[in-house]
């Protein structure tokens, strides 16, 4: 909403500052952080009161996790609240990319919220049917990708950009909806699998958000896109504001999620944030780069796929436990060791992913 102050810039020249995406991104980040810092304790107290026993802890998981019994979940509500407030205040409300990404984020968040609700009320680690959840996610993601395809109305909007090769894109046509939907759903569930230790998921999410905030800004700027020889997608620069809001809300959440966590993100947050990152990657035509920047999420998801496939085919497990962060727990790594080392890996992968912008 603050973007509309630009209309009064002719009378008050200082209001021209609201034209700049960089300024509004910073404002969204500060707003998101302050909102979570201010209302976080109230949200935690209410969730603890309403949930009673909190998130159920798996009996077949690492024994060290039993000490976390009673910790409330659905902390994603804190992040999403800060994200929405920061976005609504600072983003251009007339930009369709903002609303498409926000719709996917909240849609996935609702799916995750319902899953968390069932787990808490039933005191079981099983939410609602995995197939049903996947079907709903696919519908939301496919609808968003269709909207993105129609929004562009040019061959690029239905194409897959290839890293390292300038002016190279694979035209997918209507298959873009399926491919893009797969990216969004895959990203959502990959982040969901990563969220297994205090602070493990939120920092890599923030690192990826900061990276894609930069990618969005560059891809949405004709001058920078031409210089870097990446695909120019008009209007996507505004997505940097959403990334800023997520970064701020994530910092606020980390304050309460740092070990020992006062609240868990839950599926409410992990599905929503993963879906958001996937949608932004599809919008700015950097789907392959998401696999690099979000490589930690890919690793976690692949470890589960390999574990399940190996057990079904051979009756043997590749890892002591999946996702892979539990494997390292079983090997004797402490929780802080795993979390901080995975953060370091995320930083390195983000730098590697950003370096591809200049490799053409």
From Swiss-Prot:
UniProt pathway annotation: Cell wall biogenesis; peptidoglycan biosynthesis
Pfam families: Glycos_transf_4, MraY_sig1
A GO molecular-function descriptor: UDP-N-acetylmuramoyl-L-alanyl-D-glutamyl-meso-2,6-diaminopimelyl-D-alanyl-D-alanine:undecaprenyl-phosphate transferase activity
Superkingdom field: Bacteria
Chief place of localization: membrane
EC number: 2.7.8.13
Cofactor(s) annotated in UniProt: Mg(2+)
One GO cellular component term: plasma membrane
Subcellular location: Cell inner membrane
Protein role: Catalyzes the initial step of the lipid cycle reactions in the biosynthesis of the cell wall peptidoglycan: transfers peptidoglycan precursor phospho-MurNAc-pentapeptide from UDP-MurNAc-pentapeptide onto the lipid carrier undecaprenyl phosphate, yielding undecaprenyl-pyrophosphoryl-MurNAc-pentapeptide, known as lipid I.
Family: Belongs to the glycosyltransferase 4 family. MraY subfamily.
Record protein name field: Phospho-N-acetylmuramoyl-pentapeptide-transferase
Provenance organism: Rhodopseudomonas palustris (strain BisA53)
């Amino acid at each position: 909403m603050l973007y509309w102050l630009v209309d009064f810039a002719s009378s008050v020249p200082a209001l021209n500052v609201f034209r700049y995406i960089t300024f509004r991104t910073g404002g969204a980040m500060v707003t998101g952080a302050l909102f979570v810092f201010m209302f976080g304790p109230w949200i935690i107290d209410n969730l603890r009161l309403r949930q009673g026993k909190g998130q159920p802890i798996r009996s077949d998981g690492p024994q060290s996790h039993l000490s976390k019994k009673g910790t409330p979940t659905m902390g994603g509500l804190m992040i999403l609240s800060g994200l929405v407030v920061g976005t609504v205040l600072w983003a251009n409300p007339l930009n369709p990319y903002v609303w498409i990404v926000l719709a996917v984020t909240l849609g996935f968040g609702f799916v995750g919220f319902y899953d968390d609700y069932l787990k808490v009320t039933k005191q079981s680690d099983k939410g609602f049917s995995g197939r049903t959840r996947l079907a709903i996610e696919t519908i939301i993601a496919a609808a968003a990708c269709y909207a993105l395809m129609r929004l562009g109305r040019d061959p690029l909007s239905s194409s897959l950009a290839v890293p390292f090769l300038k002016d190279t894109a694979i035209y997918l046509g209507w298959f873009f909806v399926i491919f893009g939907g797969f990216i969004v759903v895959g990203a959502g569930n990959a982040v969901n699998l990563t969220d297994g230790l205090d602070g493990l998921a939120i920092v890599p999410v923030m690192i990826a958000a900061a990276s894609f905030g930069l990618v969005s800004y560059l891809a949405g700027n004709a001058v920078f896109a031409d210089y870097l020889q990446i695909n120019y997608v008009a209007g996507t620069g505004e997505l940097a504001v959403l990334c800023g809001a997520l970064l701020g809300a994530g910092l606020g959440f980390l304050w309460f999620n740092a070990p020992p966590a006062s609240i868990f993100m839950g599926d409410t947050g992990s599905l929503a944030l993963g879906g958001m990152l996937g949608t932004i990657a599809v919008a700015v035509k950097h789907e392959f780069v998401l696999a690099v920047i979000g490589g930690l999420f890919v690793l976690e998801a692949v470890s589960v796929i390999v574990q399940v496939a190996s057990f079904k085919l051979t009756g043997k497990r590749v890892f002591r436990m999946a996702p892979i962060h539990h494997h390292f727990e079983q090997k004797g790594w402490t929780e802080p060791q795993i979390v901080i080392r995975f953060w370091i890996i995320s930083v390195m992968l983000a730098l590697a992913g950003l370096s591809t912008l200049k490799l053409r």
